[in-house]
Structure formats: structure tokens, C-alpha cells
Amino acid sequence: MADYLCKFAERRGLSHSRSANNCVVIRKAASPGYEDCEPLVILNHMDMVCVAEAGYDTPGSVTPIEYEENGERWMRANHTSLGADNGIGLTMALAILDDDSLKHPALEVLTTTCEEDDMSGAANLPEDFIKGRRVLNLDSEAYDEITVGSAGAHIQVARLPYRRIAMPAGYVAYEVEVNWGRGGHSGVDINSGRANAIKILANLLLVAIRQMNIKLYLVSFEGGQAYSAIPGEAAAKVVIPREDIEVFENLVMQCHEAVMGQYSQTDPKIEVTCEPSVWHSSVINEEGTHILLACINGIPTGPVEMRSDVEAQENNASCVLTSNNIGLVKQGKESFTVSSHTRSFSNDRLNGLARNIEQIFTLTGAEVETVMHVGAWQEDVGHPLIKLTMDVFDEVLHFRPRPVEMHFALEAGYFTERFPGIHIASIGPRIINPHSTTEHVSLTTADNIWQVVKTLLSKA
């Protein structure tokens, strides 16, 4: 994608720079009469969360569906994530660069990498990469809001070692799966009560060991597709004593019924299943099995603490003060990799919960790596950029967007640290269920935001 952006600039005779982390900034000179205006940075990211339902993970195998509802045009995902986050914003930015009829100050169209993972693109930008100190971010997902703050975030990845042993005699193999969880964005949707498939699966297997006294061994365990996504699917291969088959199958059935009841409103299609599997010559030793399941079970997921102020309680997107998500478990030859994504509007609480989770990991002998840490961001809502953005909404769309703080980290946290004096306004179309296979984007609001952006450029 970075290659494409550089070629895009070259074909149009626009200067550009590329960072070591493949972030790209494309510069466009001010329109006549705008030469003395302060430069404006237009910010987006080029990476997208790619998740797919089982059987639909081949690129290009499905086509998004367009439809109309109550007079509003929509595009929705079709068994895969849509990529409206941040494809819509990036499309607008490229359209601006491609249209010489627009009136605007000097522009720096900045497109970052790894925003959906560890934000390493923004975190490692050279301090002279951009000159502008006004940033219009087109990565918001709430049409009637302007984002002026974000939670801090800490992502850590633990590597839990294990040993393989020969499969015990008299054992049979099963594949246990949690499927059709709704998933979603672990910031936007963290207060929705949606199921975390990794957590459900680990809890089920730990109950089998500790409460049902089944001497269970793992063969494999994996789940999730991204740090920042609530995992809707997880799968494990296990072996159990032949005499425990009936008890184990009944336990899985009971778990399925309990999960269906608990998540009937949030994850109506979720299911927990087990099927006999092929024979395995080796399994993960007892210690490795127990450590992985206990770690996952002991780490909190979902909201940990709620905000107490009235304004936050009125806004579901920011009513959570502190949260955590286990978004990804992968298996290597000698270790499991488990990710933990902590968020908070309070830097003290962010650091405190992250330390507690790290201690859970390290007590098991795991190696822990911090892959992202960014503090909370709070914009000055009285800054001229914020006022201008709200005035343009009023002029073009006849309403003023509500300033909000979002419960997920934004690159703004890094920008305010790396570029002193910077101010950021974040807007965008209505996107529902980002990072999931039920992602929707309102094309009607995308058109409206495009009109806002063009008008804002002419007044910036």
C-alpha cells in the first residue's frame, strides 16, 4: 500500500516522503490565495482489520452488499470485515489530492501503518516528518460526533513455553470450538457485553480439568485475529481419557446452552461444539496446558471500571474508564503467544492494570513484550480547529457534532507527544460494528462528510 501511495504522488507530480515504518506523507501546495494560511494535515491509516467467517477467508471471494434502509444508503460486509475503517477516510484523502479544483491551504496527507496493531507507524515518525500543527483525522466512526479525546492503551504479548510429551495410552482426541461470536472492536464495542471466544474456550477446558477432574491435555489452542478485535472464534484440540467421553461431551453441551443463554442478545449465533478428532502422537504437557488456560482465565476481559461522571454515562462510547481484551492466541512450536490490550482514560489506571496483567504472565515463567504504549489524549475543545469543524458541520449539515472522548487509543496520543503544539479534530461517516463480519458503513453519511471536508478545506 505504501508503494501505491508513493506512485500515486509521483504520477501527479506531488512531493512525498516515506518513513522507515512505511508511513507516507504526500504534500500538495496551497491553492492561489491560500499561500499564507497555516498548513493542514489530513490523517488516515492504510492498514485494515481483516477478519472472516469460516470458509470465507479467501481474498476476493465475497462482494460487499449495498442496500437502502429508511432513505439511507448503506454498504455492509458479506462474511468478512468491510474495511470502511479506514478505507473511507483514505479514499477521501486521495480524492482531495486528485482534485485540483478544490480550494485549500498547503496540505500534508499523512497515511500511517500499523494503526490497528501497535501504532508503530505513528510512534516512530521522525519529528520533522510533518510541518503542520493542525490535523484533520478522517478515522472517526460516529457521524454526529467529533472526537476530541481518547483512552491510553497498552498492548503486551506474552510467550508461554510448553513441552510436548507422548500422547498417553487410552486417550481420545477432540476438537472443541467456539464459533459465530459477533466479535467487534474492543474499544468501541467493549461495553456491549459481547462474547470473547478465547475466554469462553479456556474457561470450558479449565472447568473440565478442575471441576470435572478430567485429566485433559492440550494439543493446540488458537483464537482471535487481531489485538484490537473481540475474538468471535477460538478452537482447541484436546485429548481426554476414553472413560471421560460422556462427561466431557455433556460438559460441552452444557457450556453451549449456558453461552447461548448468556449471549442471546449480543451474540445470537454463537455456538460451542466438540467433535472427535484424529489421533495425535504428542500432546502439550500438563504444566503447559494448565498455565495457558489459567492465564487466560485469570486475565480480565471487558470493562474493568466505569466512569462516574454524568457526561460519560450519557455516552456509551466513553462510559468505560478502564478495560482489557485478550484478542489473540497463537501457537508456535514451543510456546503460545497471548496478547492483552489494556485501555483507560486514566494513565495511572492504565499502567496499574497493565502491570497486574504482566505479573500474571511472569509468575508462570512467560516472557512479556510491550508492543504498544500510548497515553490518553485530551484535545482543547476551544481550539479554533475544533470550532471551525463544528461551524462547518452547522453550515453544511445543519447540526453541530457532539464532542466526545472514545474508549480506544488513537494515534493522536503519539502525535501530541511527538509534535508539540499539535491540535487534532477527528470526524467520519457512520460505521457500525467495525472490525467484524457485520461491519456496515452509511454511504449517505460518507457523502455528507465529504461535503463537510471540502467546505472545511476552503475555510481552513
Predicted features, each with a name:
Residues M46-M48, L110-D118, D139-Y143, R182, ...:
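Acidic, glycine-rich active-site loops and adjacent beta-strand->loop/helix elements
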Residues Y34-D117, A122-R133, V310, S318-V320, ...:
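Active-site metal-coordination/substrate-binding segment of hydrolases
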Residues C6, R194-Q211, R242-I245, I291-G302, ...:
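His/Asp/Glu-rich mid-to-C-terminal helical/loop segments that flank catalytic regions of hydrolases
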Residues L321-F408:
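Substrate-recognition/cap regions that form aromatic- and gly/pro-loop-enriched pockets
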Residues D189, N196-F221, E379-I422:
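Active-site-adjacent substrate-binding region
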Residues E72-R76, E115-D117, A123-R343:
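Midchain, well-structured core segments that form catalytic/ion-binding scaffolds
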Residues M1-E38:
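A non-catalytic alpha/beta surface segment that caps or lines the substrate-entry region
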Residues L321-T337, H341, L397-T455:
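Zn-dependent metallopeptidase/amidohydrolase metal-coordination segment
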